[in-house]
Amino acid sequence: MKNKKILLLILGFLVILFLTIFAYFRIYQTLPKFAVSLIPEAEIPGQGKTVLVIVPHEDDEVLGAGGFIEKSIKNGANVMVIFLTNGDGHKFTTQEESRKLYPKPENYIESGYQRQQEAKKALAILGLPENKIIFMGYPDNGLKNLFEENFSEPYLSPYTKQNYCSYSNCYHKEAPYTGENLQNDLEQIIKTYSPDLILTTHPSDTHSDHSYCADFVANAIETNPTQPELYYFIIHFNRFPYPKGLHINRYLTPPGRLISSSDEWLKTSLDSDTLELKKQALEQYQSQFASPMLKSLMEGFLRKNEIFSKAKKR
């Protein structure tokens, strides 16, 4: 009888341990590195194919898809990169650049122009010329508001104190900050360039600009006569990428919570030359490297591969 109780206690402990490990994996961890070999390679677009990379901030394109961009350009594809915002709502970097504890609206706008210049330099390293870049200039940290509350009424940026795009190089000059304008502009861009493939941030990304960027893109695709393929990449998620920091000999694997039997994940393997170019491109974003926390996050994407989740057709 005593042995039976001990056995039951041991079994109970093992069950609890298993469930704890499983829950930890689902919430925080990524797949083990051997799982990378089970993820199929994404086809790299070539001659006659058009790829749009649509992201909320300058640096997201290199973090999530820098290698894919470089390989697609080298393979002959027509690649365009579209930035929804100028990343002008980052207080820490604006404080650093302006040397002011309380930056003024014009300091945030100057920061936005700085992010644009960094993006041009970064993408040039990957082989993308400046005329293949579109800056839409919508409000940083405001995409959720545009999608949910300010679809028709202009949104006032708490950083730049503007409710319209005041940048000289906006895609839609002086466009009021409304979700409707952003949606219409995206639809026009997609219609104009007729992409075969769109890459954008993941709808489950924990940064609201990233998740709502995915929503705006998905809605814009729905109105398009042709339906391009849509790949998502993740930037912000629980303990992703794991581990943080520079680990160029490690692989990037999907977060456990984003894995299900119906998901189709793809990878792009990066050789040493492509990885070096991605590293050089990322280093152009010195405004972001000023923050040790951001630097650690960004360097975590310098791995031997990139990963994408293929969107399901609506």
Placement of each model-derived feature along the sequence:
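N-terminal Sec-pathway targeting helices
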Residues: 1-16
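Proline-aspartate-enriched helix->loop->beta-strand connector
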Residues: 186-205, 210
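Short, flexible loop segments at boundaries between secondary-structure elements
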Residues: 224-247
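A conserved mid-domain beta-alpha-beta active-site/ligand-binding segment of alpha/beta enzyme cores
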Residues: 244-288
